[in-house]
């Protein structure tokens, strides 16, 4: 594929009755920076295959000053994880009403973070009193009893307007919960509000032009990640114990990496997407953002409708068998990210985990496959919105949606065929290993407003760079967890990913818990 000509772009947009020829220069520029990845896809042969269906430095003084240190019983409560809060509520040593009051107060005191779009304090208190009455009657509300949860404003929440982070749709108050939210409520969770996001969940920095740019609570001036930046910021700032996120190319794991916390993307379709505003049907996943692996496990159990305590064993976890890819995931790395990954793998090996190295044929095609798939599906899902209200969209999201119209059916189909081949290569690369360990991002969290970075002597665009190691896991549909493994010399967080085979969510969570316990020693 060569760079699309102005004539081609003009003809396609006219055919689709999207008459905005004045935007041709923007469309051409947008194609230019992804062209090399796209060309790799078109120059690759397709085998006969079906289309896929569906070391840590001390914090600097400035960052250390931003850390939240508990100094009272109330502070200890908001710092507690979901498991601890639920335990205290279930044994009636802690009132849901007290929890609601404390977290609502913290959310109000941290409005400058723009972590939430809507908080209905009356509804939160009403739900808390209902939980309290159930406890007084001797009922067990469930495994998330009284746990404060922030839900990405991409999902229907009863009594809240659904905005999808945009002004291009009418924000209607929802009469019922999305399936995942209903499960959280049924497990006793307190929904404390809907969280901010990158508009339409289509971006990596959560710089929302309509509801305010989400701020990184611990690393001021750096992005919180996206698109689930509000959920990550809320959890990192202890405004919620669990954040619900969506992930199309890395939107759970990448914000977790930018905020130095935990983000779990389950196997594709393990968590229902009913009632969730779509971006890309074959890439969208729903999962939890938390401050610990244990909290991620209990949240996932509820979100996926699984039995309590089914993800993490009550006994000691043995050293796992680990595989490390030789190329791609360990190429084009920031030096400090490489050092942190080397140190983490050395710790795992010293603790008894055998680590093998493998090649993954075709993995270099991943960026192009993701670009074509996401652009095509994202534009299809939002075409009516773009055609009718494109002028109400933020410029970055509008441009992404506009350029998706120029991919042809043959482009999309070939990308899916190659996607299936890469998926099979990824599965084969595990061999007899339990998990694959890779970096969450090739670079440190960038400063807000950064468009390009220098990496290995090359100038690279921020968006595809930050999702380079997460998006292949999305289009393969594998479970993966992002968790802290170190910090840079300046104190910025560095996360690794624990990746498993499709359906091996429990294995990923158990290995991640083993890694977490090892880091705490």
Model-derived segments and spans:
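N-terminal, positively charged, Ser/Thr/Ala/Gly-biased leader segments
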Residues: 83, 93-96, 100-101, 105-169
